[in-house]
């Protein structure tokens, strides 16, 4: 595709994005930035959440996954749905009852300052690296399609990308994010549906032919029960999906900031359940698209790219279809990647301001000043991390993110699980040590699992092991004659 056409498409999208961001975030105060003033309609948040769970990584990588993994990803997505129900009926009422700005305030109330800072710092590392990986993917794609033809270096690409994310989130925060996520969801769903339509048309498939082509393909196998050593094994994927969504959605300030913007916890529960079920069908569309892409390359004799992540971009922008397919791909990619990055930047700003600096205890004017400075700082750090990823990239992006989450979200999951399901008090100053040792032990296990466990490969279930080690470590720190954890009444507010 012509770089000029792509540039015009991107500029048009950003004009719409900035207009929505300005209208939604107009006159937003600090509460509006952090939790949307808790006035968001649940059905708007639910629609927005469908898109917020889909990043540029999903948009680009999931269609290419079908060659190696078939539809096995849906096994994990089924686990996501179960995890969403757990979040809706356990975590959401708890967070609303405590009237939290940052969900990691719960750890201070339950254990103490050390666990609070541990949770906040682990989130900071997780979200910063995860957001950087996602933006790195879109930067690579834009570099190939737009910046490279104009001989613009990668560093300029990164600077412009981060600057755009900062600009449309600096004013409205969560209030802006919800409405920009609505735009993102609409663009994503329309893009993938129309891409399926145009590719099916080029293959001369009507609806029944489309369904039979996908269902008859070896790439559409969904359930894997045969080999427990296979990374696609059902119970590995399903259980990993349950715990991954609890950790990456329920215990993630980025995702929960939208849920906490609903008027009350019952509205938030409706949002969680609706968006969780809808996500299954959206992911199914991406996998269907992947089967069609591989079917198309096979019939046309097109050599598949070296990396599965490159399949969708190569076909969509390679003049194999009408130009609208390439435009739809770019809109979908930009919508997913920039919205996810903006959400992460807002969450990082909130967590660092509230959890690390404790600035929420200051007056409104001082808080606004600190928040704006932190927002700039987070954008700068994100740009640096993206550039470093460009130097280190050597693995599938989606695997890298889930593996990363297993190491960094595991201690957070273990901390919350211990706090919610036990009433024991622990020696708070030693909690950071447990949070560091648990991922280290998991790394040793994962590196040697095949040799130690007769060929068994640890994959996404690493998150469960990590949380379990953290939980056991906290058991070793239980105080003698412990009683129920004290509750800070100042944090509790009934809704």
Predicted regions and their residues:
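Membrane-embedded helix-loop-helix hairpins and adjacent transmembrane boundary segments
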Residues: 1-495
């Amino acid at each position: 595709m012509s770089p000029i056409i792509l540039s015009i498409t991107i500029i048009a999208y950003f004009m719409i994005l900035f207009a929505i961001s300005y209208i939604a975030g107009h006159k937003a105060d600090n509460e509006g930035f952090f939790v949307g003033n808790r006035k968001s309609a649940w059905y708007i948040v639910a629609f927005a959440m469908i898109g917020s769970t889909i990043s540029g990584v999903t948009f680009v990588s999931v269609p290419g996954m079908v060659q190696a993994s078939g539809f096995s990803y849906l096994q994990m997505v089924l686990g996501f749905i179960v995890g969403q129900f757990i979040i809706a009926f356990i975590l959401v009422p708890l967070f609303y009852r405590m009237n939290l700005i940052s969900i990691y305030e719960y750890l201070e109330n339950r254990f103490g300052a050390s666990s609070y800072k541990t949770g906040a710092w682990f989130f900071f590392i997780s979200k910063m690296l995860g957001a950087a990986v996602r933006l790195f993917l879109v930067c690579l794609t834009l570099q190939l399609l737009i910046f490279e033809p104009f001989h613009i270096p990668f560093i300029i690409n990164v600077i412009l990308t981060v600057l755009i994310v900062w600009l449309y989130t600096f004013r409205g925060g969560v209030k802006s994010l919800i409405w920009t996520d609505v735009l993102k969801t609409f663009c994503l769903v329309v893009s993938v549906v129309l891409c399926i339509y145009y590719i099916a048309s080029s293959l001369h498939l009507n609806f029944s032919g489309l369904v039979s082509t996908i269902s008859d393909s070896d790439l559409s196998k969904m359930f894997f029960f045969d080999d427990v050593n296979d990374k696609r094994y059902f119970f590995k994927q399903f259980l990993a999906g349950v715990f991954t969504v609890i950790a990456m959605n329920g215990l993630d300030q980025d995702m929960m900031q939208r849920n906490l913007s609903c008027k009350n916890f019952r509205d938030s529960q409706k949002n969680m359940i609706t968006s969780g079920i809808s996500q299954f069908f959206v992911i199914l569309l991406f996998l269907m698209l992947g089967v069609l892409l591989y079917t198309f390359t096979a019939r046309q004799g097109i050599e598949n790219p070296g990396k599965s992540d490159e399949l969708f971009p190569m076909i969509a922008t390679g003049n194999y279809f009408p130009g609208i397919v390439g435009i739809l791909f770019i809109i979908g990619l930009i919508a997913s990647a920039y919205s996810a990055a903006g959400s992460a930047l807002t969450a990082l700003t909130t967590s660092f301001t509230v959890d690390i600096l404790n600035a929420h205890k200051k007056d409104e004017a001082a808080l606004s000043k600190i928040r704006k400075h932190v927002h700039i700082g987070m954008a700068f750090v994100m740009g640096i991390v993206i550039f470093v990823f460009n130097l280190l990239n050597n693995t599938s992006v989606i695997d890298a993110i889930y593996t990363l989450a297993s190491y960094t979200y595991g201690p957070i999951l273990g901390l919350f699980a211990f706090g919610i399901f036990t009433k024991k008090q622990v020696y708070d100053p030693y909690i950071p040590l447990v949070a560091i040792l648990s991922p280290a032990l998991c790394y040793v296990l994962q590196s040697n699992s095949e040799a130690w466990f007769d060929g068994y490969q640890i994959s996404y279930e690493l998150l469960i092991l990590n949380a379990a080690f953290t939980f056991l470590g906290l058991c070793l720190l239980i105080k003698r004659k412990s009683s129920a954890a004290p509750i800070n009444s100042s944090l509790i507010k009934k809704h």
